């Protein structure tokens, strides 16, 4: 059975911020980046444990291929849910304010 993808409000706000930031310079590029991020997140429905564990126990980090972003998420196997916690640029401190 597929896991349900759920987003923390912070993760949704970060996706919107990424889109807005890139759109200011390249609207087509912004759509490509967000599509790539969402495609990788969608894979977690089937493969929730595919990304490596982060330094923080219980949190995984999934790099976005071709783009400098990382998705941080947690898996709840009992509820069969994947919680998207943060979407960060790779230049940012990866563990700052993770919850």
Task: Give the predicted meaning of each segment.
Residues 1-59, 77-78, 85:
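Basic, Lys/Arg-enriched alpha-helical interface segments
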Residues 56-58, 66-69, 91:
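Short acidic/glycine-enriched loop/turn segments that link adjacent beta-strands
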């Amino acid at each position: 059975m597929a896991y349900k993808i759920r987003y923390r409000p912070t993760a949704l706000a970060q996706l919107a911020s990424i889109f807005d930031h890139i759109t200011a310079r390249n609207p087509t590029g912004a759509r490509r980046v967000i599509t790539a991020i969402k495609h990788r997140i969608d894979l977690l429905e089937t493969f929730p444990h595919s990304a490596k564990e982060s330094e923080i126990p219980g949190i995984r980090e999934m790099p976005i291929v071709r783009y400098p972003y990382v998705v941080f998420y947690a898996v709840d196997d009992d509820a069969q849910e994947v919680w998207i916690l943060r979407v960060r640029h790779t230049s940012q401190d990866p563990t700052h304010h993770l919850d």
